[in-house]
């Protein structure tokens, strides 16, 4: 059975391509997900991508991952990275390994973005590589 990878996208990532392209790039979330799906097929893994602007919905999806056979999570929690103890607790509670991904370099941004509630429990952190960060995370997840 192929490994199952879940990609979670947090709030406002549905606006990629139009929201601050100088910070987040010009690629849409649909384009990023299509590229990830193609790469997953090449690598022989199952990939599911899901986005929500709502913290509770993201928590629910993380909890569901513990029952649906998800082997690894790639998460860009976006703004919730810096505020959500609930996401942290959900990720810790399901004990599925995960990588935290950010399109922009958090440390070149406002100081409130320098703290993550997720990083210390993540397998790794990829920040500032744009959409390529998701690809790097997927390649790692397949080998983990």
From Swiss-Prot:
InterPro entries: DHquinase_II (IPR001874), DHquinase_II_CS (IPR018509), DHquinase_II_sf (IPR036441). It catalyses: 3-dehydroquinate = 3-dehydroshikimate + H2O. The keyword Amino-acid biosynthesis applies. Substrate binds at residues 76, 82, 89, 103-104, 113. Keywords: Amino-acid biosynthesis, Aromatic amino acid biosynthesis, Lyase. The record marks 19 as: Transition state stabilizer. PROSITE patterns: DEHYDROQUINASE_II. Pathway: Metabolic intermediate biosynthesis; chorismate biosynthesis; chorismate from D-erythrose 4-phosphate and phosphoenolpyruvate: step 3/7. GO terms for molecular function: 3-dehydroquinate dehydratase activity. The keyword Lyase applies. Pfam families: DHquinase_II. One of its GO terms (biological process) is aromatic amino acid family biosynthetic process. Homododecamer. Belongs to the type-II 3-dehydroquinase family. This is 3-dehydroquinate dehydratase. The gene is aroQ.
């Amino acid at each position: 059975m192929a490994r199952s990878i879940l990609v979670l996208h947090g709030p406002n990532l549905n606006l990629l391509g139009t929201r601050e392209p100088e910070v987040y790039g010009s690629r849409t979330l649909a384009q990023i997900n299509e590229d990830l799906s193609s790469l997953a097929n090449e690598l022989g893994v199952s990939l599911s991508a899901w986005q929500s602007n709502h913290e509770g919905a993201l928590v629910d999806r993380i909890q569901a991952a513990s029952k649906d056979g998800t082997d690894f999570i790639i998460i860009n929690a976006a703004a919730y990275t810096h505020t959500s103890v609930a996401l942290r607790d959900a990720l810790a509670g399901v004990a599925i390994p995960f990588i935290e991904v950010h399109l922009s370099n958090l440390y070149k941004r406002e100081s409130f973005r320098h703290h993550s509630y997720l990083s210390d429990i993540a397998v790794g952190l990829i920040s500032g590589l744009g959409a390529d960060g998701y690809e790097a995370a997927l390649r790692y997840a397949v080998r983990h």
